[in-house]
Structures are given as structure tokens and as C-alpha cells.
């Protein structure tokens, strides 16, 4: 399965469209021009999924959530609040009006690949979160270092 990799800055035109960069489009490895956009539950951004990738996500949600449990149904409603969009002939995607407000009034966005999907950030918001003062290396070591050591595949030598 091909995955999009990378980070790209894009301009948003006056109609709310942006051009999907060639590098990210190639990484999506799909002939289908349909995509799904939804608000992220983890950050103030949008998520761009391939249509097939989102179908897999829905299948997973349907297996894991109980439609007769009120809390699960509320969660499902939030996760399914999305729009299907299509690439136009110029490889542009129109950001739906109800989701455009998540991007403030920015004329510039950042597309950040997260493997299964691409985050769509307002440029200013992305710059703020990307420059936060947390110790990134320490957090990675705490979260992933112990997993590598448990698996016996640590490349690091403790000195």
C-alpha cells in the first residue's frame, strides 16, 4: 500500500480551492479522484483521506462501535461528519464551506502527511504548533524508545 509522504505549503484561491501537490498525489497511488475531508478530532485542522482509505476507516468504526450505545453513536456522528470532494481537471480540491472555517481565513495552508491521511492546516496555526517548546526527542524516546527496547531492535547505544 502506497502512502503519501511529505509536507507541502499551498495557496488557497478565492473560491477555496487548493492544488494537490504532485508529490503527495503520487504517494496516494489511486486513480479515484474522490476524497473525503473531515475535521480532525486531535487538532485544529482537517483530514484528507482517499475515498478507499476512508471506506476502510468506516469499516473499522462499524466493527468497533456499538450502534445501540448512545456514546458510541455520538462518537460515530462526530467521526462521520465529512464531505466527499473530487479533484477537478487541474488537480484542485474545493474545501467545503462548513469545513473552511476550521482553516480561519488563511490564503495559505500546509499539507502534512500522517501516513493514512493528510492533515490540512491553516499556515499560521501550523507554524504555532510546529514551534512549540516541548522536547520532541525526549517525548519520542519515552513513547517509542521503550517499544524498540522491548522488541530488541534498538539502534541506540546507551552511554
Question: What are the residue ranges of the model-derived segments?
Answer:
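A short beta-strand-loop micro-motif that forms or neighbors metal/cofactor-
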Residues: 29-45, 82, 101-126
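A low-complexity, Ser/Thr/Gly/Pro-enriched, surface-exposed linker/loop concept
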Residues: 43-69, 142
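Short, structured motif recognition centered on aromatic/hydrophobic residues
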Residues: 16-20, 91-95, 118-120
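Short, solvent-exposed interaction modules
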Residues: 56, 62-100
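A positional/architectural concept
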Residues: 2-43
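Short, charged/polar, Gly/Pro-enriched secondary-structure boundary elements
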Residues: 55-57, 126-130
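Acidic/histidine-enriched, glycine/proline-rich intrinsically disordered or flexible terminal extensions
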Residues: 134-159
